UniProtKB/Swiss-Prot annotation:
The lineage of its organism: Viruses, Riboviria, Orthornavirae, Negarnaviricota, Polyploviricotina. It comes from Influenza A virus (strain A/Anas acuta/Primorje/695/1976 H2N3). Inhibits post-transcriptional processing of cellular pre-mRNA, by binding and inhibiting two cellular proteins that are required for the 3'-end processing of cellular pre-mRNAs: the 30 kDa cleavage and polyadenylation specificity factor/CPSF4 and the poly(A)-binding protein 2/PABPN1. In turn, unprocessed 3' end pre-mRNAs accumulate in the host nucleus and are no longer exported to the cytoplasm. Cellular protein synthesis is thereby shut off very early after virus infection. The keyword Ubl conjugation applies. GO terms for cellular component: host cell cytoplasm; host cell nucleus. It comes from the Viruses. This is Non-structural protein 1. The dsRNA-binding region is required for suppression of RNA silencing. It is found in: Host nucleus; Host cytoplasm. Residues 1-73 are annotated as: RNA-binding and homodimerization. GO terms for molecular function: protein serine/threonine kinase inhibitor activity; RNA binding. Homodimer. Interacts with host TRIM25 (via coiled coil); this interaction specifically inhibits TRIM25 multimerization and TRIM25-mediated RIGI CARD ubiquitination. Interacts with human EIF2AK2/PKR, CPSF4, IVNS1ABP and PABPN1.
């Protein structure tokens, strides 16, 4: 196993522990708490994949971080912070919408890279909007936290989420996953539109209805892809 992979996991575990202590003092805002919860799932998945104990890794990560801080001067820290581009966290959904449980009458699921696409194909003839919470850097989607499809009544009928055991995805990965979700939902004559935030940062091009133009052949192909890979 690559030593950098192990040490990266150890540092991530310790930094999560620090953030958890911060949250326990009721100091974190909603985006902070949301990332904390999702990063916990990611660490569990990575720990299982690597065969590493999280508690042991956290202690090792603490030693690594302490060593770095001992060697770090205040001036070097200022220069590092100044050179790192700042990302923004954008929210279409409330914390309640993100954490709400939902179920599917006719579940369909597809794994695309490090993203999991889920939808209820029992939903027909509905107006649906896609909403997401994600971070943006250089005016492009950086990391998808969660995307969900909502009916006008507020019911959740679809979802795109990162797989905890496979961290890392690009804006193109997210764009392709959204296309698959839209294709599957439109297969049952649902009308799907995308939130303005997603249009701006994930799609870059859309029609007047607020969704990307998908040719009928592409929609049918996407829907068949989901059915064949479940």
């Amino acid at each position: 196993m690559d030593s950098n992979t192990v040490s990266s996991f150890q540092v991530d575990c310790f930094l999560w522990h620090v953030r958890k202590r911060f949250a326990d003092q009721e100091l974190g805002d909603a985006p902070f708490l949301d990332r904390l919860r999702r990063d916990q799932k990611s660490l569990r998945g990575r720990g299982s994949t690597l065969g590493l104990d999280i508690e042991t890794a956290t202690r090792a990560g603490k030693q690594i971080v302490e060593r770095i801080l001992e060697e770090e001067s205040d001036e070097a820290l200022k220069m590092t912070i100044a050179s790192v581009p700042a990302s923004r966290y954008l929210t279409d959904m409330t914390l309640e919408e993100m954490s709400r449980d939902w179920f599917m009458l006719m579940p369909k699921q597809k794994v695309a890279g490090s993203l999991c696409i889920r939808m209820d194909q029992a939903i027909m003839d509905k107006n649906i909007i896609l909403k997401a919470n994600f971070s943006v850097i250089f005016d492009r989607l950086e990391t998808l936290i969660l995307l969900r499809a909502f009916t006008e009544e507020g019911a959740i009928v679809g979802e795109i989420s990162p797989l905890p055991s496979l961290p890392g995805h690009t804006d193109e990965d997210v764009k392709n996953a959204i296309g698959v979700l839209i294709g599957g939902l439109e297969w049952n004559d649902n009308t799907v539109r995308v939130s303005e935030t997603l249009q701006r940062f994930a799609w870059r091009s859309s029609n007047e209805d607020g969704r990307p133009p998908l040719p009928p052949k592409q929609k049918r192909k996407m829907a068949r892809t989901i059915e064949s890979e479940v």
